[in-house]
């Protein structure tokens, strides 16, 4: 857990103004849609910082702040994979490729999406449903 959570200014500087807008859009969507606990930590290999959204010990998703972009990580268990497959055609080809290329572990399919702009925001909202 981070002792000092990065400020909006620090995130804006790290991500860049355009990418920071996307970050804020996704964070605001999650906060408006779900009641979640937010946990900050160092991002290790995935980014400088990680912002994890959790409820009752279960993680909804994690954002990894990086220089000029960020990663959006979601882990799909069996039921979430079935939901994705049932509405697969609603997702862009790029998101389908991220899904297909993601590794499946004992606890689910770990999908990491690199975010540089608003291109995947609607897909991400659909992935969170």
Task: List the predicted regions and their residue ranges.
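Charge-rich, low-complexity N-terminal segments
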Residues: 1-46
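Short, Lys/Arg-enriched charge-dense amphipathic segments
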Residues: 1-2, 58-73, 112-115, 127-129
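Generic recognition of short, well-ordered alpha-helical interface segments
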Residues: 18-21, 25, 67, 119, ...
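Well-ordered alpha/beta subsegment
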Residues: 94-129
């Amino acid at each position: 857990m981070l002792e000092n959570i990065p400020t909006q200014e620090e995130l804006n500087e790290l991500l860049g103004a355009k990418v920071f807008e996307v970050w804020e859009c996704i964070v605001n969507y999650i906060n408006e849609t779900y009641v979640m606990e937010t946990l900050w930590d160092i991002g290790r290999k995935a980014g400088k910082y990680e912002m994890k959204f959790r409820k009752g010990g279960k993680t909804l998703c994690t954002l990894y702040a990086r220089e000029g972009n960020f990663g959006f990580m979601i882990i799909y268990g069996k039921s979430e994979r079935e939901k994705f497959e049932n509405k697969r055609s609603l997702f862009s080809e790029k998101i389908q490729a991220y899904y297909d290329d993601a590794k499946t572990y004992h606890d689910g399919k770990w999908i990491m999406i690199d975010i540089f702009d608003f291109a995947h925001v609607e897909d991400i909202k659909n992935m969170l449903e």
